[in-house]
Amino acid sequence: MSATASTRRSGRRDDRPRGAARREALLEAVLKVVADVGADAVTHRRVAEVADLPLASTTYWFDSKEQLLTAALELAAARDIARLQEFAAEPPEDFIDPLDLAVAAILEPLDESLQASRGSLLATYLLLLEAARRPSLRGVAKEWTEAYLKLLGRLFKQAGSADPAADAELLLAAADGLLISQLAQGTGGDLGPGLRRLAGALVTG
């Protein structure tokens, strides 16, 4: 039976995603499951339920849980790396100081709604920590980190840093630590001023 005929008989449209969009919807579901209940809870069945898609769609695209987790981290990384590249190509006009830009590059995703950004952050950090015991995730984690360090290193160099690469690593590590602490404690707050002071202190020594 054709899809059109099926739709006519049922009297309703099936607006669920198909093709590549279906794959992306499944990966969005993986990220949601990770944020809600952790990476260990990711299964083909649970992902299909969260995505509101047939179970067969998960096994069509992904043979294993390892593939689900890796592809989900790849999706999150690709999106953020694209954001960083766009940020570097067209930095916000209201930022002139390179250290202000460095802090903004890290914290820009948090300008979205609080709930959405916290869920995204939690899924990201949980998957990055999974790389400690899942080697398949390490390549993505390294590529993602290097994208940040490349941009931050360039900005520290513009600011006159004596060791831009080391300063970039320290600023990124501090930001990660503070963000993880906020997630763990269920708190919020603007990390920008503190990170900016740290960036300035790194440059001035």
List the model feature ranges, each with a label:
Residues 1-21, 32:
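N-terminal intrinsically disordered/low-complexity leader segments
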Residues 81-82, 115-125, 132-159, 166-169:
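Amphipathic alpha-helical packing segments from all-alpha helical-bundle domains
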Residues 74-80:
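Short, basic, alpha-helical segments at the C-terminal edge of helix-turn-helix-like DNA-binding modules
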